[in-house]
């Protein structure tokens, strides 16, 4: 009888744990695809490109901007969404600071409508030595406008926190370094744009500038986010 009670209790505890884990996974998936990411994602398409010839990343941006259907273009080295940031550890004021890093085009904050809480942020005149931190990192580390990291890199702005990562860890220390090396491109289309024309134009542009690259899959950002977090949904189903 005692053994039976132990087995029943153990089964109950395991069941409760699985229910909690399933709920967390489902909440993360549901949030990322249905709730406000605190960015302007309307009419945004995304694609990635491999095997870009050195120095041609910005050429792709400039060529895409010639299409009448496309209102604006920005880019990043890794996907701006999902858990694709690199994690750096640096010393600041005698304290070890770990933070997530994205390398981005200077206009990415304007493109996604991410406001600066302080400072000018990044722009077309920014250099590779300029970077922006999020509000969470500012409050957590004391880094502020004008402070330097690794002697040369200077904080140019403090951005509003956004939900471009997993909910699992909530907001994290995030830094966005200005770069001219990209693999991910984001297009904002005009209202009523010819989507098929845009997709064909993207593919022909990539083929012309980066002939060794695979043909890109061009999709709307919301579909991209659903796909990124598809594994989370699968885990939810498997665990449940």
Summary of predicted features, one role per range:
Residues 2, 40-42, 94-97, 126, ...:
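Short, solvent-exposed coil/turn segments
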Residues 9, 13, 26, 103, ...:
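Alpha-helical architecture
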Residues 1-73, 197, 214-219, 223-240:
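Helix-terminus/capping and membrane-interface signal
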């Amino acid at each position: 009888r005692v053994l039976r009670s132990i087995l029943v209790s153990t089964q109950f505890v395991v069941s409760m744990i699985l229910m909690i884990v399933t709920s967390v996974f489902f909440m993360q998936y549901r949030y990322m695809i249905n709730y406000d990411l605190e960015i302007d994602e309307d009419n945004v398409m995304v694609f990635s490109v491999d095997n870009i010839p050195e120095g041609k990343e910005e050429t792709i941006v400039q060529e895409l901007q010639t299409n009448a259907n496309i209102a604006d273009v920005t880019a990043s080295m890794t996907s701006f969404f999902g858990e694709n940031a690199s994690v750096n550890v640096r010393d600041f004021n005698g304290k070890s600071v770990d933070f997530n890093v994205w390398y981005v085009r200077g206009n990415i904050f304007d493109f996604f409508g991410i406001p600066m809480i302080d400072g000018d942020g990044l722009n077309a005149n920014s250099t590779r030595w300029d970077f922006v931190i999020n509000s969470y990192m500012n409050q957590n580390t004391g880094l502020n406008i004008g402070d330097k990291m690794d002697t040369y890199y200077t904080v140019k702005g403090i951005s509003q926190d956004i939900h471009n990562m997993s909910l699992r860890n909530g907001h994290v220390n995030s830094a966005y370094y200005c770069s001219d090396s990209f693999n991910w491109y984001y297009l904002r289309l005009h209202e009523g744009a010819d989507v098929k024309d845009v997709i064909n134009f993207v593919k022909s542009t990539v083929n012309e500038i980066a002939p060794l690259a695979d043909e890109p899959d061009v999709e709307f950002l919301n579909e991209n986010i659903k796909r990124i977090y598809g594994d989370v949904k699968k885990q939810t189903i498997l665990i449940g």
